[in-house]
Amino acid sequence: MLHMNSASSADSMEIMESHFDPTQQNDSTIIESRYSPEEYLEQSFEIQRIISGENSEPQTVASQEISDSQEEDTTLTSSQFEDCGTEYNEVVEDDEFRSEDEDDFMDEEEEYALYEAELSSSPSIHEEVIDCNFVHAIRGFEATVEGQVDATKGDMMILLDDSNSYWWLVKMCKNLAIGYLPAEYIETPSERLARLNKYKNSETSNSQQSVTLPPLDIVEKTLEAPSPNFRIKRVTFTCSSNSSDDEMDSENDYEAMVNRTVAENGLEIEFSDSSDSSLSAEYRSESEDHVTDSPAYVDLTELEGGFNQFNSTSFQSTSPLGLEIVETEINGSSTTADSKNSHSPYSKFSSAYPDAENSNISKINISIAGNKELYGNATQSDPSLYSTWIANKHKTASSATVDSPLRRSLSVDAMQSNASFSSYSSTSNTDKSLRPSSYSAVSESSNFTHDVSRDNKEISLNAPKSIIVSQSDSFDTSNVTQDAPNDVEKEPISGQMPNNLSVQSLKQLEVYPIRHSVSIEMPSEKLLSPRLYSSSTPSSPTKGFQKDDEEDSENRKQADKVELSPSSLLRQMSLPVDSSSQSDAQCTTSSVYITAERKAFSQSSIDLSTLSNHHVNNEINRRSFAGGFTSLADELSEMRELLHESPAPLECNEEMVIPTPELDASSAIPSSSISHDEDLLPRKNTEESTSSSSFSSLITSPASLQYDENPFKQSVVAELNNNSSSVPFVDSAHASDIHAYDNDHVSTKNKEFNRRLREFILDPDSLSGLYWSVKSAGVRASRRVSRNIEGESVSSDLDDIFANVLKGLSDEMASLLNTNR
């Protein structure tokens, strides 16, 4: 213990010596130490205690307690000193920071104010209106070179030129000096106006910030004001009817929903199910009237099933609109064919107009009900509509009238559907209207039995045993289908159909030939002209054309005595139809028409045996008359004049002879208009063949040609005498060419041309003729041999022959030209 005290005392002495060294002290200087003030105090107290302990080693308890208390006091004072120093330092630092920030802020404001003062011509603009004719200097400028002008801040100037972006030419208003100033030193009127608005806006914002707020007590009173109370009105519902529990539950839910939705509006809704209301009574009376007026409108469920064959008894009832409803008795239960009448478009209308049977509405609806297109699309969805359509067709057919024979022949009444044939009267009057006799809607034989399938639920009509078809140009039996008859007549058309034409079934139609008795007597001094007809104009198979009902009997007698021309004889001559042209579903037209080509007829050239033996394909070829002729008679009359009343009969040969064409030098076209096309060459079924390489047989010898005053006479007579068709004909273009030329048209130039052509044909080595022929007009060789014509190969054969002829001539010409060189 002593040793430790001595060591510590030695250390303390060293410390004291270092601190109290007189050499280290100076005048008016502060003692510097390596210890802090707190450490220095501690060291001083420690030194004092050591000194006191060395002097008096035995220490009393009181002295120890005093020393302990002193130590506590010293430690307390040191901690307090430390806390005070820290707080003081913080306060000093904060003050310094605040002062620095304030200084910086003040410096920025001053700088900004100075900057604005420098850029603006004046710190504030006093004038309220800016004059756009002047500019102002926003800072001062001193001229350094000649051409510049001095300006002070706020000077008013007139801008003379601002084309340069850096220097503007101005005129000073104070001394009228003219010079250049930097553009950035000049304030334009728009810039001055913007600065004025800036000052005004700042003043306005400052004034708005000074607006006084309302007193607090007023605000509290406004917030504490009570809101208005809304009165909710309760709505009750009463129901007087006795209903089941389920209905009551649903109604209660509905009432509760209505209560929630309409209570706010103060509405009152009553629910009443009483059956004695006027509305229900009116509705009940209307429904009773509907039932009494149309008892046949009932739901039919049996038709939705299936029944194939039954013996039915029927009766008819008429709806308010005149629609006949056919009711059938099936297995003792009476049902109605007009089932599910709710789908009918006339159900509501019939209930609204119960007395419309004798009105015009009933007549209109009868015609609508008779339309097949209206009911045809609805038969698959509702079979009762079709039965209603059938019933109305029976009624409308008895009262329908046809205006004219043309409409009669074009109407759908031409096709009759019946189970048995009725006898025909061939001598009936032609102007008799088509009025069928009485006919029951559904007969006992059950021709139109409704076969309703369970699976498909579609109505299909059983095909009748036979169908009687009237002969008409516009009627085509290919339109006959198994859907439904076009019309139901009570009896077939009298006088419109011969007895020997019938159709046995829909799948196998056979058209029998109709032979008419035609008088062979021909008029004496009159050429026969056929009737003009078209595809839309029907031709009746009876004598003549039927006249309208309004024409008198005299016109009808004249129509019966119309003279028949050869073309009309051919048209009315019926020929058997090949079985190969028939199919299962379609057949040819019931009236077979044969139309001959337009031929030249004379009084003595008609031979009935020739016409009857002439077999021509069953097709109609209509061509217009050439040369402006309105009829065949005018054309033939002109032809007879050109032929100088030639009485030579027309003979039918098996060979076809076409003379050599005569070329016209001026027009370089054949003088004969006979064409080598396929449609003008009759077809024959011979098996001869001619080689295309034999050119000598294809070129007509010029020795056989003889000249006459009319060069066409010989060629025309030769063709008419050697025509291969069994029916004589003259092409319409040929007739027009004959009419165009006359005897005076044959000139010496044409004869010279023909002579040179003949010389060239005889002597192909003639270079001049060959060159002239090929260069100017070309050569077309015509055939003078008999040849088989098979179908469509005629045109191709002729083209090949002509091409070979021209090719040979061209080769010869080229070889001759090469040799002459």
Curated annotation (Swiss-Prot):
Swiss-Prot/TrEMBL GO biological process terms: establishment of bipolar cell polarity; establishment of cell polarity; establishment or maintenance of actin cytoskeleton polarity; establishment or maintenance of bipolar cell polarity; maintenance of protein location in cell cortex of cell tip; protein localization
Biased composition (Low complexity) is annotated at: 268-282, 529-541, 665-674
Which residue intervals make up region (Interaction with win1)? 599-821
For the SH3 domain, which residue ranges apply?
130-191
| Region of interest: Disordered | 1-36, 51-79, 267-292, 333-352, 473-500, 529-570, 664-697
Cite the GO molecular-function annotations of the record.
cytoskeletal anchor activity
Instruction: Enumerate composition-biased segments (Basic and acidic residues).
Output: 283-292, 554-563, 675-687
GO cellular component terms attached to this protein's record: cell cortex of cell tip; cell division site; cell tip; lateral cell cortex; microtubule cytoskeleton; microtubule plus-end; non-growing cell tip; old growing cell tip
Among Pfam families, the record links this protein to: SH3_1
Please indicate which superkingdom the organism of origin belongs to.
Eukaryota
Which residue windows does the record flag with biased composition (Polar residues)?
1-11, 21-31, 53-67, 333-350, 473-484
Q: Which PROSITE patterns match?
A: SH3
> In which compartments does the protein localize?
Cytoplasm, Cytoskeleton
User: What ranges does the record give for the region Interaction with tea1, renumbered to this chain?
Assistant: 527-821
**Which sequence positions carry the modification called Phosphoserine?**
36
Protein keywords? Cytoplasm, Cytoskeleton, Phosphoprotein, SH3 domain
Gene3D superfamilies noted in UniProt: SH3 Domains
Residue(s) carrying Phosphotyrosine? 35, 40
How is the quaternary structure described? An essential component of the tea1 cell-end complex. Interacts with win1, tea1 and for3. Interacts with tip1 in the presence of tea1.
Q: What does this protein do?
A: Cell polarity factor essential for the bipolar localization and function of structures containing the cell-end marker tea1 during the normal cell cycle. Regulates cell polarity in complex with tea1 and together with the stress signaling MAPK cascade, contributes to cell polarity maintenance under stress conditions. Required for the localization of for3 at the cell tip specifically during initiation of bipolar growth.
PANTHER family xrefs: BUD SITE SELECTION PROTEIN 14 (PTHR47775:SF1)
What protein name does the entry list? Tip elongation aberrant protein Tea4
What organism is recorded for this protein?
Answer: Schizosaccharomyces pombe (strain 972 / ATCC 24843) (Fission yeast)
**What's the name of its gene?**
tea4
